[in-house]
Amino acid sequence: MLSRRSAFPLHASVLVALLAASSAPTPLYALYQAEWHFSAMTVTVVFSAYALALLGALLTAGTLSDHLGRRPVLFGALLAEAVAMAAFATAQGVAALIAARVVQGLATGVATSAAGAALLDFEDPGRPGRATLANGITPVAGMAAGVLASTALVQYAPAPTRTVYLLLLTVFAAQAAAVLLTTETAHPRSGAWRSLRPGIAVAPASRPAMKLLAPGVVAAWALGGFYSSLGPSLARLIAPHASRATGGLVFFTLTAAAGLAVLAARTLPARTASFAGTALLIPGALLTLSAPHPHSLLALFAGTVLAGTGFGAVSQGALRLLLSPAAPDERAGTLAAYYVLSYLAMSIPAVLAGLLTNLYGLQRAVSLYAVTVIVLTLAGLARTARQPSSV
């Protein structure tokens, strides 16, 4: 059996791998488009198939590990993730790509809440706050690692649409085997079938923070969804003759900046981190909005850095405010509720952006998207400023 000390980094690596797999297709969309001849709208549908499937899993199975145990739930989800990677590697068209994204989303939704709760369970009592920090940084670190590896393979590998998925399949299979060697930390209890009824289980003590943080979280993840789905297309619009890797580097820049912000924000009060991060989304969105007009990649990447920094700070502050007051048996549900809100914010606006791109062109869609994010951000800042600091 793995020791408690070894189990913590294992579950952190699971979250990194899950989010690496979620971002791996981003640099490949241009290759898929060139081979299968589909539109920007189809790109956002493929992207959102993953996010909506993940939402369905969180709404139904987000608390399943509280009832059945972390270990069996996580083992099954990782095996399903490996199946999804095999489906990606063998996909021959858009329908197969969407199907693989759906399987991946379901598996990730189940695994994310279970692994995140396990991190809290395995936290060293002598190092409080480490699990919340890990829950904040592993998703963005995973997305950064996934998009960077995929971008490198696009540039240098002979079969980039297969290689990255076969590597991830191997990782998930190894992690599934390692999870079986960990100690079970949840105490299985009855009610597993009832827990599958769609619903959101936010800890009562965390509900005021959820209401306060919602606009900022929605704005941050909506901006992240844009960069993930249409970031490469925007880079090609601005610099049509740039390297194929440029589109992937846009999303890598976002996630790398977010990861650094999570680390920096851990020393700030949680509410301060969330407020400052929300404020940074405004200049990030404005620079992104302005980038197509002078055809400036510098403006795009500067906006991406600001947006990523805001994204990371918002995520770090929000997770600390939400998870700190939750009881141990409320953690998985509260974490799942946070991800439900986040992925709704990430997927629905991205689909609308794809529709707007088809109707009016990418440049106008970028403008409308940026304005929407700014309005949400201002609403979040106003709500935070009005609430007492004790909330």
Where are these regions (language model features)?
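A late C-terminal transmembrane helix in Major Facilitator Superfamily
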Residues: 311-313, 318-370, 380
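C-terminal transmembrane helical hairpin of 12-TM major facilitator-type secondary transporters
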Residues: 272-316
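Conserved MFS/SLC helix-loop-helix module at the cytosolic interface between two early adjacent transmembrane helices
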Residues: 55-94
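Helix-loop-helix hairpin linking two adjacent transmembrane segments in secondary transporters
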Residues: 130-180
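Helix-breaking motifs and short loop linkers at transmembrane-helix boundaries and internal kinks
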Residues: 37, 69, 90-95, 158, ...
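Cytoplasmic helix-loop-helix junction between adjacent transmembrane helices
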Residues: 100-139
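Transmembrane alpha-helices of Major Facilitator/SLC transporters
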Residues: 247-270, 284
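Structural signature of the two symmetry-related core transmembrane helices
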Residues: 72-87, 273-288, 367
